[in-house]
């Protein structure tokens, strides 16, 4: 599981660094290279909704190992690509594997361990996932400079081989004995909605689409979602059952994830941009400055369980979400005169809070799911995580652009634009605290208590 999570996290950050080099090598306009990113993201958005059904139908071991193989073969094909078309097609294959790896891996954990151990196990398994984004930009820059852009993909091959070996040897094979009906129309509606919404977010953040196509894509996505849920209420076996939202911890976890990730999802975009554009850091120095954030997040994993045991999910998430928003706002106050040690301390504290936030949110969302709805609930969480992070980047890019106006990047007023953007993003994150306040004091502890009294 950890190997797959690491590959996914590494790929999310390493590719962007190499786009200019790819464009030069493939003799393409750099602006056209965004299709390399979009092909992967749209494939993942389209297939995540069906990951749970596929895993239950064909077995978690087979699908998880197969997903690693697809991702690895896709990486190999990307690494030997000699044209943009071949590279985009290879990224689609890589995206098919990526859409299944993490959701199915998390489903295996959910099925394998008692709920009272979920926080501890999830914290351990996601540690390598934190390493991926940490080393991605720096490793990508070094590979492009020292070797070539091809190696940002080829580096996945040995990792994938190791992951496949361990997946086949140690992954339990959970599979439904009775064949569950596949809701094909529901899949088309829901996946179509995910693709349309993802495309609108990419258009807003990276493709510089006009407002009309962005709004139209967003409306189409929302309309498809409405049609899906209206239909799901009236059929027997929908792709995602509306009954999932009768589980309070799941509903609160999903809604809280949306708002918290809307704020937090902007940080991988905003922080490096501010350090380089606002403070004049080099890409290498920016990567090194981000290290305390990830190291602190890793160091916080062992203390998440004791905090949740002591305070419970409700108090932990309400307090921590407010702190998260305040820390995001605090990044807006960083300026050219801010001592570097203060910046490093701020990022380290943010990393600690982040780690507690997302481990708590994710386990809260999954902790009360039963055997018959675990796959659907887990896939729904994966969909929300994918979309809300994209929404965070798109909304922060739009805010920064709006506050900047016609100001050139070297103008001192750009710092005011960053300041206003961080305040807004932090405020969005704080809104999640009101959602987590709807939890009951004992939520998240029920299963453990039942087992102890059994």
Q: What is the meaning of each model-derived region?
A:
Residues 1, 64, 71, 87, ...:
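Hydrophobic alpha-helix/TM-entry signal in multi-pass membrane transporters
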Residues 1-10, 15-17, 30-31, 36-37, ...:
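12-transmembrane solute porter fold
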Residues 18-46, 84-88, 284-288:
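Extracellular/periplasmic helix-loop-helix junction of adjacent transmembrane segments
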Residues 25-26, 31, 56-57, 79-82, ...:
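Membrane-helix boundary and inter-helical linker elements of multi-pass secondary transporters
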Residues 42-46, 76, 130, 134, ...:
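Hydrophobic/small/kink-forming positions within alpha-helical transmembrane segments
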Residues 45, 72-73, 96, 157-164, ...:
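Small-residue-rich packing faces within the transmembrane alpha-helices of Major Facilitator Superfamily
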Residues 48-185:
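Helix-loop-helix hairpins in multi-pass membrane proteins, especially solute transporters
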Residues 157-175, 191-203, 220-234, 432-440:
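C-terminal membrane-cytosol helix-exit motif in multi-pass small-molecule transporters
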């Amino acid at each position: 599981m950890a190997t797959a999570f690491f590959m996914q996290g590494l790929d999310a950050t390493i590719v962007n660094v190499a786009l200019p080099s790819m464009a030069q090598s493939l003799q393409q306009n750099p602006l056209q290279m965004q299709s390399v990113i979009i092909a992967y993201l749209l494939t993942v958005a389209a297939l995540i909704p069906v990951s749970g059904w596929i895993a239950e139908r064909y077995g978690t071991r087979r699908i998880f190992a197969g997903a690693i193989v697809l991702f690895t073969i896709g990486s190999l094909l990307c690494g030997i690509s000699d044209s943009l078309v071949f590279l985009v097609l290879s990224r689609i294959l890589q995206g098919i594997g990526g859409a299944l790896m993490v959701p199915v891996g998390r489903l295996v954990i959910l099925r394998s361990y008692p709920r009272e151990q979920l926080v501890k196990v999830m914290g351990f398994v996601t540690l390598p996932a934190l390493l991926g984004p940490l080393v991605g930009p720096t490793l990508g820059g070094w590979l492009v400079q020292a070797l070539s852009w091809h190696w940002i993909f080829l580096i996945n091959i040995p990792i994938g081989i190791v992951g496949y070996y361990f997946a086949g040897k140690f992954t339990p094979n959970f599979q439904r004995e009775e064949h569950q009906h596949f809701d094909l129309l529901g899949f088309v509606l829901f996946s179509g909605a995910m693709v349309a919404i993802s495309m609108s977010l990419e258009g807003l953040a990276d493709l510089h689409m006009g407002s009309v196509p962005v709004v139209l894509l967003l409306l189409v996505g929302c309309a498809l979602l409405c049609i899906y849920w209206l239909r799901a209420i009236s059929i027997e076996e929908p792709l995602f059952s509306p009954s999932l939202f009768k589980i309070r911890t799941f509903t609160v976890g999903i809604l809280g994830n949306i708002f918290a990730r809307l704020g937090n999802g902007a940080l991988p975009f905003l922080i490096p941009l501010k350090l380089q554009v606002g403070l004049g850091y080099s890409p290498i120095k920016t990567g090194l400055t981000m290290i305390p954030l990830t190291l602190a997040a890793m160091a916080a994993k062992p203390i998440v369980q004791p905090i949740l045991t002591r305070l419970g999910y409700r108090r932990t998430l309400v307090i921590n979400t407010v702190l998260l928003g305040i820390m995001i706002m605090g990044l807006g106050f960083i300026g050219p005169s801010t001592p570097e040690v203060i910046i490093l301390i701020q990022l380290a504290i943010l990393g600690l809070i982040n780690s507690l936030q997302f481990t708590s949110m994710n386990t809260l969302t999954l902790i009360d799911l039963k055997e018959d709805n675990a796959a659907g609930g887990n896939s729904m969480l994966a969909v929300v995580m994918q979309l809300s992070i994209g929404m965070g980047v798109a909304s922060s890019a739009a805010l920064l652009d709006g506050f900047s106006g016609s100001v050139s990047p070297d103008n001192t007023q750009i710092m005011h634009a960053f300041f206003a953007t961080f305040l807004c993003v932090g405020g969005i994150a704080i809104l999640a605290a009101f959602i987590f306040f709807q939890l009951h004091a004992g939520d998240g502890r029920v299963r453990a208590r039942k087992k102890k009294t059994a």
